[in-house]
């Protein structure tokens, strides 16, 4: 809508139109009555009655107010602005002394009333703000004018009526803060003629959800427009702008001769009203039926019109029909049968063509899928080779060094095989000595890499340990949020961590290094013991050497000793109480007795986490370090592939979500025994022996995984196996017998595990097999010489 079209709108009409779109009873009636006290209400009522009597008494003077004011109710004019006490006194004095004044005084009194009314209305008009209401979560926006001093409860009741929601459930928020029923916009600092946004939502969204208001025109917008109603007189009118795509017809208008602006009639500016559809109307004769029971014959069959004297019948439209060949009913049905055959032939041809096209499309999609799968496998293989190459050249973890020693053993076996082909004994010995020297050099190189990796892991472990000690104490509240608290111990640990990080900094100037050493000295000086004395002596020695001009690279050993001693200082609970929670060795020896085991290989007492216990083992014998050392010196096996196989088993069982727990009891040695000794490290179907492509899936997918309910297959074979509805229909009898035999071997081996033994004993099949091959006589016990049996 243009400005010219807006100025043409008449103020009363536009005000009524806006009131029809959004009718809020509060700001015009109830809101103002609630703001007026009972005493003021009594005074205003007296004022209105007295003013009405005065106007009726002097009606012959024909004094009239402008149309815009007369169109409004009198009580609205009085209630929009709260009159001051001085004005009310003038009204009372004017009414009491009206009979004694002259006619000129009475006219001046009416003019004063008129001026006061204009001031009151102008003040009320200026206190309106534009409010944009956003319905959450519907996302509908409604723009409307609202008084800044009116309470929010009228706005809430209005939208509660539109949304059909109880007003006590509906909530309103301004700038993220819920507003009260008796609060207003002016209390939140909103000034007149400002544009604000408020959110409307439901406190019980499940029972009373907020939906879109269907009755409002889409794209409609209500704005406040100031129009001129007289000389130096303006009025604000709420105007609704309707965005419509209909063609506005030109229904006439006029053009301003001076400005040249065109003003169209109101019919071209508003959406035409839809004409209601009328129901189908029928005459009375069409709704009644007259029944006749006698037979009648039409008149056309009783007479024939022909040419005769006095009558001429034209034969221009007549046709000469010649009789065709006669065909019998059998010929007619045969012709229809031939037509049906032709139609069926065409349909079958079309249907076969569609079927072939669908098969061709399926074949194309299948070939594309197979191609993508092949590319995926190639990428996975390349990624595995790339990671294997990276592991060999940059070993970091224990698995990486196992892989290196395994490759070394394979290389040594190949070289030994070639050496054994030599004819003479001297050549074989010389070749074996040369091979031993090369092997020694490779082992030394691996040892250097391991030393570097240990230093890196030690630094990372130290930083992680300090971060854990200096972390704040956290709790999770019932609402999901986290509460953090710092104690004096965590603050102390954080201070020591910051000093440790400063000590590790390099490329510092001499003054900066002296400041760090001074801070460290003041921190350590708080406690007196042998450790702190050593740290202080080393600090003094470094300061002395720095003053003598010794270069930094010559002080690296001294600085490393200071760092190591300071780490011992940090890990002492006397100096850092927070560290006592994270030490492997607890301060109370009584808590440590049940978790200490003796290693028969290295003759050391170690905590339980340093031992790897298999489910089939009955006692703790050797620690992890001794087992790894034996593997490096003798077998040199790599367990990385078995670890990946075990990880794939864990992930596949987690997807079932049936609370299976036997798979998670399997250790690395168990899965290795199950793969090598029972399944021969190859697929049961295709005999594929690459462990990177094999998975251990359930034999019966409806029963949880166990060593006696599994099968070793490739990834593709495992996916196809799990899609089988019945194992008996999918495999042959001999293959099923072979798999069950392997399951019996697994049961015999894992029956040593107490947890698994209880599950195995419940199996009727294994009991039947054991009873079939059991013997009544006990086995013979062979007693060595020198031992007396009990």
From Swiss-Prot:
Gene3D superfamilies in the cross-refs: Phosphatidylinositol 3-kinase Catalytic Subunit, Chain A, domain 1
Superkingdom of the source species: Eukaryota
GO BP, one annotated term: mating
Stored SUPFAM superfamilies: Ubiquitin-like
Role summary: Adapter protein that anchors the radial spoke 1 (RS1) complex to the A microtubule of outer doublet microtubules in axonemes. The triple radial spokes (RS1, RS2 and RS3) are required to modulate beating of the sperm flagellum. May play a role in inhibiting signaling via MAPK1/ERK2 and MAPK3/ERK1. Additionally, may play a role in the functioning of cilia. Not required for the functioning of tracheal or ependymal cilia.
Organism: Rattus norvegicus (Rat)
Keyword DNA damage: no
Subcellular location: Cytoplasm, Cytoskeleton, Flagellum axoneme; Cell projection, Cilium
Gene label: Iqub
Domain Ubiquitin-like, first and last residues per copy: 129-205
Bias-annotated ranges (Acidic residues): 29-44
Protein known as: IQ motif and ubiquitin-like domain-containing protein
GO cellular component terms, A-Z: 9+2 motile cilium; acrosomal vesicle; motile cilium; radial spoke; sperm flagellum
Signal peptide residues on this chain, from the entry's feature table: none
Subunit description: Component of the axonemal radial spoke 1 (RS1) complex, at least composed of spoke head proteins RSPH1, RSPH3, RSPH9 and the cilia-specific component RSPH4A or sperm-specific component RSPH6A, spoke stalk proteins RSPH14, DNAJB13, DYDC1, ROPN1L and NME5, and the anchor protein IQUB. Does not appear to be part of radial spoke complexes 2 or 3 (RS2 or RS3). Interacts with CALM1. Interacts with DNAJB13. Interacts with DYNLL2. Interacts with NME5. Interacts with RSPH3. Interacts with RSPH9. Interacts with ZMYND10.
Domain IQ: residue ranges: 336-365
Region described as Disordered: 1-100
InterPro entries linked: IQUB, Ubiquitin-like_domsf
Basic and acidic residues: compositionally biased ranges: 85-100
